[in-house]
Amino acid sequence: MVKKRKNNGRNKKGRGHVKPIRCSNCSRCTPKDKAIKRFTIRNMVESAAIRDISDASVFAEYTVPKMYLKLQYCVSCAIHGKIVRVRSREGRRNRAPPPRVRYNKDGKKVTPTQGAKTA
């Protein structure tokens, strides 16, 4: 039988069993090593209200607290939510992370190689 992935879609080497976690989106039980994990940092207040809060605040330099979330998705929710994409057979062999899209102050896309040239 043909193997689709070298690691069988999980990060379990030499362990017999891994404790399941619950998907952040649908609460499905998924092995911890198979789940797609993303760590996000967000402001607790939306960006439109930050200026209003800072104007109304008594303190001069008040920083709005941030939310630190570890999101863990099952494979189907990660694909549906476009956190990961289905890749071709050759694409599955590529272990490098996808290139990150960066924006400059004007809101235009900048590739890391362009940023190094201009600096």
Curated annotation (Swiss-Prot):
Q: Where in the cell is it found?
A: Cytoplasm
One annotated Gene Ontology cellular component of this protein: cytosolic small ribosomal subunit
Q: Where the protein is mainly located, per its record?
A: cytoplasm
Pfam families in the cross-refs: Ribosomal_S26e
Which example biological process does GO assign this protein? translation
Per the record, which residues fall in region Disordered? 1-20, 88-119
Q: Which family does it belong to?
A: Belongs to the eukaryotic ribosomal protein eS26 family.
Main function = Component of the ribosome, a large ribonucleoprotein complex responsible for the synthesis of proteins in the cell. The small ribosomal subunit (SSU) binds messenger RNAs (mRNAs) and translates the encoded message by selecting cognate aminoacyl-transfer RNA (tRNA) molecules. The large subunit (LSU) contains the ribosomal catalytic site termed the peptidyl transferase center (PTC), which catalyzes the formation of peptide bonds, thereby polymerizing the amino acids delivered by tRNAs into a polypeptide chain.
Quaternary structure and partners: Component of the small ribosomal subunit (SSU). Mature N.crassa ribosomes consist of a small (40S) and a large (60S) subunit. The 40S small subunit contains 1 molecule of ribosomal RNA (18S rRNA) and at least 32 different proteins. The large 60S subunit contains 3 rRNA molecules (26S, 5.8S and 5S rRNA) and at least 42 different proteins.
Q: Which named protein is this? A: Small ribosomal subunit protein eS26
Query: Origin organism of this chain?
Result: Neurospora crassa (strain ATCC 24698 / 74-OR23-1A / CBS 708.71 / DSM 1257 / FGSC 987)
Source gene? rps-26
